[in-house]
Amino acid sequence: MGAMIGITSSEDVADEFTAINKYTARATWSNPTSSAMWTMIEITKDPEKVARLDAERAQYFQMIKERADIFMKEAADCGLKILPYLSGFFITIPMIGSDKVCAALEKEHIYLVPLKKGIRLAVCSVSKKKIAGLAAKVKAAVDAADIVQ
């Protein structure tokens, strides 16, 4: 959400400003999503396609859940604190000093997102193979950085 404000004493300039920005806004924000919107409209017209979409969505939900379950169990086992997690794309690891921990992990080619008060792990983008053992690596980096969670 945003606003575009034009200030002028000329009605012609104000009208041109409005027309240009209507066109630009539609071209910038409406068109990129229109293909996806039309695709969803076509899918929802066909019960078979809806069933396939639901099955695919359930498959990805389960895949992310399995990854998160692995990480949460391993985090509990090694004493790495995490924020409560029910479902979703991200798990948050609370701490102050996340930049230091993430920098250390990057040296091992582990790329997490440092936040002001923690680290965000995208369980949606890390394979099960790579998520296994990750909690212990994060915990080791936290301990090496002398950070108290």
Residue ranges of predicted features:
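Conserved PLP-binding catalytic core of the aspartate aminotransferase-like
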Residues: 53-105, 125
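Active-site lining segments that contact anionic ligands and/or coordinate catalytic metals
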Residues: 1, 86-90, 107, 116-118
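Short, well-ordered loop/turn and helix-capping segments at boundaries between secondary-structure elements
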Residues: 7-8, 45-49, 140, 144
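Active-site PLP attachment segment
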Residues: 1-16
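PLP-dependent enzyme catalytic core of the Aspartate aminotransferase-like
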Residues: 99-149
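Structural signature of PLP-dependent enzymes
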Residues: 15-37, 42-72
